[in-house]
Amino acid sequence: MLTRLKATFRYFNNVVPFRLGPALITTAVLVTLLLLPVPEGLKPKAWGLVAIFLTTIVAIILKVMPIGVMAVMAIVVLSLSQVTSTSSKGAIADALTAFDSPLIWLIVVAILISRGLKKTGLGSRIGLIFISLIGKRTVGIGYGLAVCELVLAPFTPSNTARGGGIVHPVMKSIANAFDSDPAKGTEGKVGTYLAMVNYHANPITSAMFLTATAPNPLVVDYIAKATSQSLHLTWTSWALCMLLPGLLCLLVMPLVIYVLAPPQIHATPNAVAYARAELAKMGPMSPKELVMSGTFALLLLLWADVPAMVFGTSFVLDPTVVAFVGLFLLIITGTIDWDDVLSEKSAWDTLVWFGALIMLAEQLNKQGVITWFSEAMKGAIVASGIGWGATATILVLAFVLSHYLFASTTAHISAMMLAFLTVGVHLIPPEYVAPFMLMMAAGSAIMMTLTHYATGTSPIIFGSGYVTMGTWWRVGFVMCVVELLIFAVVGSLWWKMLGFW
């Protein structure tokens, strides 16, 4: 009997287009969650939404089918179950709400723009220049990418534009110069390591400057509200507070990733000579390379809000608008064509799966799940009677780790941060409130490390295929812990020296 069951399982596993074992596990998770009693304080439909969200995450982790298919599954199940509406028309409208998100289109267009770097050869040229300067060791190239992030961060309010639209194309070009390409199965040479450094520099620099990511001003506003305006961070005070722990994180991060996701190529002693020889063969920049570099420079200036600094706030442009301007310029100048846009599969794949995850996260908030979670956390801490140190630790960890439920830092901060800050103000002695607030501010960026959908930058880099999901989540969790420890220990001492507590 057992032999027959095994044979039947193997047969179906070979004929169905999905992995049967993971599919059965995912189905069991969904059924189990739906059979559990609805937690007090949640409506049945809200609990059904939680079940759909968690099942989708499990299906993605177990790789039942490609992530885009799992996203479509989530849309179908949510629409049929009508957990967000009283009709299928309302449910499908809810399921598709995130696809008009400017953030998603910023990601898609940034991927499309990066195609121009490859097509024109400018990306290869940049990669070779980079290698000719610092290409003797792979870890040195990693530090170079981190420095690029650091230099751009104060002037680029969109961390997605910075990490995914500016630095990532350079990283891909460097990887290609070493013949490290996911399409060839050679991503492990240097690509996986450099992609991880490319990504993990992004949350660190986002924490270091008020203008390095969009939700930081909201964090400042919430801190001021929670402390009744007694702690109001300016651009300068934010940068000063985050300077030392942030720089230490940037110093440590490439080394930690070097251990967690080591490149197959460690030393590249001949790379500098090779790069210089290849640059000599390429000759001067072609007209299309000049157009591409000019467009790239324009994007950087507009993403850094330079026109607004010079001419006033009426010249502020949304990062997504800027991205579309860049894409349009590349198309009308013939630098890329419409077939290039249509054939960039990773952009459209990202549109589907990231849109679905953002939609699920937004619906969790709308259905009151996030508020319920926040209130339950507050109640549990108050009832436990634990000391203020443990309270602060639990609040920071709960806030950061709950980002597994979110596909947007702005949505997470908007939904939960003020509630957590308010609890902290009530339960932590006044003289220790400031370091708690600064830890929460740092944590609001550090939480980006956790998943491949944590912020707009992550799906761009993950979608390029250099890093598996298992590696991404493993490295992400370790880096989250390391960075939190650095900010908690070094940051707290630094803030004491600065007189914040």
Write out the residue ranges for each language-model feature.
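Hydrophobic transmembrane alpha-helices of multi-pass small-molecule transporters
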Residues: 1-106, 226, 230, 236-375, ...
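Membrane-embedded alpha-helical segments and adjacent helix-loop junctions characteristic
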Residues: 10-15, 38, 69-183, 344, ...
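Hydrophobic, membrane-inserted alpha-helices
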Residues: 27-31, 51-58, 145-151, 198-201, ...
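Hydrophobic alpha-helical membrane-insertion segments
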Residues: 60, 197-210, 353-363, 426, ...
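Alpha-helical transmembrane segments of multi-pass membrane proteins
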Residues: 107, 139-153, 179-206, 232-241, ...
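Re-entrant/interfacial helical elements at transmembrane boundaries that shape
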Residues: 160-176, 195, 208-227, 270, ...
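C-terminal transmembrane helix pair
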Residues: 177-183, 242-246, 355-360, 370, ...
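Membrane-core helix-loop-helix motifs of multi-pass transport proteins
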Residues: 178-266, 457-490, 501
